[in-house]
Amino acid sequence: MKRIFSLLALLTISAPILAQSYDNAICPLDLPISLSGTYGELRHNHFHAGVDFRTGGQIGFAVHAIKDGYISKVSVSPTGYGNGVYITHYDGTMSVYGHLSSFTPEIAQRVLREQYSNESFSVSINFSEDEFPVKQGDVIGKSGNTGSSAGPHLHMEIREEDGNLPTNYLAWG
């Protein structure tokens, strides 16, 4: 019980600091904001740790980096996020973009090489800070319907603690 109280106290104290780090973030899509899923929903087989942006039942909308950082990981899987991009930001937070229909051409080439090298469709590739830097607004892929998705949308998460702690950034206003 003491551990739970300590964790809650830490989160309460740090919330204003975490909120400040996303004051200047932009929307990842050039569409009116409309959510089909929110943080904290209990799904039949998991806790929903992000938000789902509607894309009007269509795929292929440009997905933008919400802040400066670097692409630290991409993943491809027939389940979960499907095609996913992970951006590490310079303040220690991470944004995750899931169910993409495609990556940028440079990332797509790396993914294809890795798939052939591993003789596997599913891959997870980590990158160093200097390989794929991104600026706020850069296109990192296209919205889609890959992985465990019930329809076209963009799944996005914000994680703290070096990418290990999903957080409800919508609660910050």
Predicted segments with their positions:
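A solvent-exposed, charged loop/short amphipathic helix patch at secondary-structure junctions
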Residues: 111-122
